[in-house]
Amino acid sequence: MWKLKIADGGSNPYIFTTNNFVGRQIWEFDPQATDPQQLAKVEAARLDFYHNRYKLKPNSDLLWRMQFLEEKDFRQNIPQVKVEDGEEVSYEAVTAALRRGVHLYSALQASDGHWPAENAGPMFFMPPMVMCLYITGHLNAIFTEEHRSETLRYIYYHQNEDGGWGFHIEGHSTMFGTVLNYICMRLLGEGPEGGQDNAVSRGRKWILDHGGATSIPSWGKTWLSIMGLCDWSGCNPMPPEFWLLPSYLPMHPGKMWCYCRMVYMPMSYLYGKRFTARITPLILQLREEIHIQPYDQIDWKKVRHVCCKEDMYYPHPLLQDLLWDTLYLTTEPLLTRWPLNKLIRQRALQKTMKHIHYEDENSRYITIGTVEKVLCMLACWVEDPNGDYFKKHLARVPDYFWVAEDGMKIQSFGSQHWDTVFSAQALLASDMADEIGTTLAKAHYCIKESQVKDNPSGDFRSMYRHISKGSWTFSDQDHGWQLSDCTAEGLKCCLLFSLMQPEVVGEAMPPERLFDSVNILLYLQSKNGGMPGWEPAGASEWLELLNPTEFFENIVIEHEYVECTSSAVQALVLFKKLHPGHRRKEVERFITNGAKYIEDIQMPDGAWYGNWGVCFTYGAWFALGGLAAAGKTYNNCAAVRKGVDFLLRIQLEDGGWGESYQSCPDKKYVPLEDNRSNLVHTSWALMGLLCSGQADRDPNPLHRAAKLLINSQLEDGDFPQQEITGVFKMNCMLHFAAYRSIFPVWALAEYKRFCNLSSEAISKPSK
């Protein structure tokens, strides 16, 4: 049976940590765990997901929940409550539902204080990992029989009805998703006609019916070239010489968004070396299986710009294609021949590798994310197959695996801190410290231990890095990459805990460390008042014309986001209240400019575009919360009024809200099919309205939403998993498995607090 291990570094000599592995979560298969009742529950969960896989794509993340609840012998002792049609919502009903949710969720806390949860969903995370381990000869060492079985399960369970695989679990079939997962199945041992429900042959049919693998997008062409399934001449240039350009040039990699920089850094190294894996009999078979014409007859030059229409989200401007053609036809032929291959190309490769090693060391070989992790790991192996750099990478591979009832997948890199700070705020809002003091103390400890204590090593500015001391990451401290919203939410939590008795929640964070966090936020704010995610924004917008991907938007440079801005405004408003003497004028200016940015980017219909959640309900929750913290009200701010009107306009008949993920790529509000409600969206909208003072104007919409949340609670106190709720870069969805538990509890807590409910009946909601 699979078991989740917490804060465990194991005995691998090539792994190291900055904080005793607080926040680390790894899955291991325990052959001794053979309890028949537990095994039966796991198998039942798998079958239930399989039979409903076309109706509900995200899993309920049940395996670790079963493990934790069993280990803690949790039993829900608070009776379930329902509010019948025509029945009045009572204080007692809200309190009972809230207590049930809080006690259940407290039992799901890990021993180090964080809340584990899946953070996955893209269908292109696992295949490159399998390809890399196959190439390097470590596939059998890392992927045990149990790993293979669960990985194949995930691929089978998320195959679409037409035989293909999507860009993400909710998406329509794409060439990128289908080719990568097809190759993954074959590398893991499936034959050409193998796989559950004829998965392999159905996948191959989809590929061939849609033009074959030569129409895969550019990232796919790169991986196929690495595997020997395409020729490098079929790829647009990715010259490592970009790293030799003067840093003052607008297109220098140091001015890129960090994820773009970190993806194309190892890609350019592998491209510059034209690295291709050893051609095995299986590779020769795959060449015959995924192309519509014989491999040696493909005109690779003609397929460089070809992209399957199912994959195309961001068509390349003509200017970009002309740039690639120029590099392809003139520059690359010179740089790959003597003497320039010795004078320039080799120097560029060495500098690129220097940056790779620097980034690896400063993230403890987790790297910034899974796409980058695999490419950097492969680059280290290409440089030295027996070197310590590669061995350190192997030691951190388990940090990316996650197992649930739908199988094993690769995570983005983990959302431990993000989920924990939201969880802590939800529990704090419940005002139940007398019942869950130990839980709060452990969460406080985890958050304090997860703060980044130092800047990147050495002369970090020469490596195009920025200050990180005082920040928080998305996952754990070892990851090392500062994030503005994670820093703001971590700061807010520490400030809230500082208001409580230390004998209950532990000692408050020292002021100096709070000041470090404030310094990060002040450093990152843009001239327009907005907050970027990772690094200061300000590079030229026209650089987005050079976006080399076909399936993402706004990835070339850093941008500002309403969510990051709101989180920072809320944190600094609370900080100013508790520490009024520290950099007061700068903090006040930040709050004023941040609020103005939130107002300025509101859409004409009153909505705000959510960049990291689905989508306009998510954006509205953050925007209204940030404006309220800055002193903006329904009466004195037109943006608040428009935002409230937007939310009330899209409230559904059952009192909830439900938004399709299509809102994200379409950039316009799209409701769920059949006007279904989603409890996470409902929670976001409810909290946004509460921030705006809706309880004082007309509480009925709030009562209707609360009734839906109460009546949707499950027998054990949890809430059901519904549609996917996370997103990044407009077009790729992320499954935040903890959201279904966190936000309904948080919303009910805020509802109870804002509505001043009495023990008597408070409302008669509409049916």
UniProtKB/Swiss-Prot annotation:
Keywords assigned by UniProt, alphabetized: Isomerase, Repeat
Tissue-specific expression: Expressed only in the epidermal cells on both sides of the leaf and not in internal leaf tissues.
Pfam families assigned to the protein according to its UniProt record, in alphabetical order: SQHop_cyclase_C (PF13243), SQHop_cyclase_N (PF13249)
Catalysed reactions, semicolon-separated: (S)-2,3-epoxysqualene = glutinol
UniProt GO cellular component terms: lipid droplet
A GO molecular-function annotation: beta-amyrin synthase activity
Coiled-coil region list: none
Record has Isomerase as a keyword: yes
Enzyme type, top EC level: isomerase
A biological process from GO: triterpenoid biosynthetic process
EC number(s) stated in the UniProt entry for this protein: 5.4.99.49
Repeat listed as a keyword: yes
Source superkingdom: Eukaryota
Location of the active site: D485
PFTB repeats: 148-189, 640-681
PANTHER family tied to this protein: TERPENE CYCLASE/MUTASE FAMILY MEMBER, TERPENE CYCLASE_MUTASE FAMILY MEMBER
Protein role: Oxidosqualene cyclase that generates glutinol, a triterpenoid product. Glutinol is probably required to coat the leaf exterior as a defense compound against pathogens or herbivores.
Protein family membership: Belongs to the terpene cyclase/mutase family.
Protein name (Swiss-Prot/TrEMBL): Glutinol synthase
Source organism (scientific name): Kalanchoe daigremontiana
